[in-house]
């Protein structure tokens, strides 16, 4: 196998907007998510409206559209 072809795998945290922090390993430093297993309707049994419009607005803002 060739050396130095794989990205560095290190300890990182996944942070949800609900406040849940999940330690894990990844090639990325910090990962931020909008929905995790603590607040996802499938796991909680409580349905809630997911703001899809906010995602579109963030995309447009990010790419200057």
UniProtKB/Swiss-Prot annotation:
GO terms for molecular function: metal ion binding; rRNA binding; structural constituent of ribosome. Keywords: Metal-binding, Ribonucleoprotein, Ribosomal protein, RNA-binding, rRNA-binding, Zinc. Pfam families: Ribosomal_L31 (PF01197). GO terms for cellular component: ribonucleoprotein complex; ribosome. GO terms for biological process: translation. Gene3D superfamilies: Ribosomal protein L31 (4.10.830.30). The keyword Glycoprotein does not apply. Its cofactor is Zn(2+). Zn(2+) binds at residues 16, 18, 36, 39. InterPro entries: Ribosomal_bL28/bL31-like_sf, Ribosomal_bL31, Ribosomal_bL31_A, Ribosomal_bL31_sf. Binds 1 zinc ion per subunit. Binds the 23S rRNA. Belongs to the bacterial ribosomal protein bL31 family. Type A subfamily. Part of the 50S ribosomal subunit. This is Large ribosomal subunit protein bL31. It comes from Desulfitobacterium hafniense (strain Y51). The lineage of its organism: Bacteria, Bacillati, Bacillota, Clostridia, Eubacteriales.
């Amino acid at each position: 196998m060739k050396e130095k072809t794989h990205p560095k795998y290190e300890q990182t945290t996944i942070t949800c907007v609900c406040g849940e922090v999940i330690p894990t390993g990844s090639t990325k430093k910090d990962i931020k998510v909008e929905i995790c297993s603590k607040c996802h309707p499938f796991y909680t049994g409580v349905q809630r409206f997911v703001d899809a419009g906010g995602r579109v607005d963030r995309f447009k803002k990010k790419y200057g559209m």
